[in-house]
């Protein structure tokens, strides 16, 4: 199923429900840095997020150093943000919350 790029108004409405996420200037990606208590918590978050990403068939761009995980989401095929990006961001928020973040 081809995902359609979201309109700016829809993106802004979705962003209102995502604390700490930043929208890039072109409104083509969102990003957030998650900070955990330690590496084990960060890796647990990444594992849970990876399982959800596989189920969605939508994969993040991310970078991990010790307790920090930097995440950027967009849909390359659509040339911007789609519903999948916000589904994955919300799943990541739940995974982080389970770890006290």
Swiss-Prot record:
Pfam families: Pterin_4a. The keyword Transmembrane does not apply. Its EC number is 4.2.1.96. GO terms for biological process: tetrahydrobiopterin biosynthetic process. It catalyses: (4aS,6R)-4a-hydroxy-L-erythro-5,6,7,8-tetrahydrobiopterin = (6R)-L-erythro-6,7-dihydrobiopterin + H2O. Keywords: Lyase. It is an enzyme of class 4 (lyase). Coiled coil: none annotated. GO terms for molecular function: 4-alpha-hydroxytetrahydrobiopterin dehydratase activity. Belongs to the pterin-4-alpha-carbinolamine dehydratase family. This is Putative pterin-4-alpha-carbinolamine dehydratase.
């Amino acid at each position: 199923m081809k995902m359609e790029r979201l309109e700016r108004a829809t993106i802004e409405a979705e962003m209102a429900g995502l604390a700490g996420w930043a929208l890039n200037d072109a409104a083509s990606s969102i990003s957030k840095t998650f900070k955990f208590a330690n590496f084990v918590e960060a890796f647990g978050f990444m594992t849970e997020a990876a399982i959800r990403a596989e189920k969605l068939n939508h994969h993040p761009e991310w970078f991990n150093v010790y307790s920090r995980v930097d995440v950027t989401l967009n849909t390359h095929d659509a040339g911007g943000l789609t519903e999948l990006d916000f589904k994955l961001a919300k799943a990541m928020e739940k995974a982080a919350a389970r770890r006290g973040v």
